[in-house]
Amino acid sequence: LMVSGSKECRLWLMDTAGIGGDDHRTDVYTTPAFCNEDVNFASAGIWGSLATWLDKQGNRWVLSPFWGPQHSKFKFPITNGVTKRGGVAAFKVQEVNGKIELVPAWISRDMDQGEPPVIANGVVFAYGSGENTDQAYYDVGLADVASRRIPNSTHAVLYALDAQTGKELWNSGTDIKSWLHNGELSVANGKVYIGTFDGMLYCYGIAK
């Protein structure tokens, strides 16, 4: 099986033995849209890569970053506050009535443009990029230009979440002074690394 995401904020579960089926358009399962209710393809939807992990009970998890608020019609069994700017959504790959589905598990706290997470030792490391992703404005219309986007960007925040519930365990607060564009985290030797637009590399680890 493989999973892909889309800017309309759906996940698509496919069989790698025949992706798309005989008609090249049939998947195993498609989630309803869990964000991007306003169909905003600039500042909402899934823009980053997915993550997956296998827990001790043998459950396969799929985690998706997303931008924008949670869809009002989509319900997660575990929530962690109101999600307005983005976050991480977690699903389990499970058999339901004889068919394989992506079953919603939890949604994270609000993050300023949720970006791709990494899972290590039962902890989800995720971040909000702080980037201004607007591409059109009421005063000038379409204006996807650095002169507008950079000044309106803020700063990234790194989060540690419980992988089973999405509960926040820690965040970097205002430590990180800049934002980033389509970046990825790295986790190695008990440390988490995140780079930012201003050329800085931040490293976090457990205090000894």
Enumerate the language-model features and the residues they cover.
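Extracytoplasmic/lumenal domain signature
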Residues: 1-208
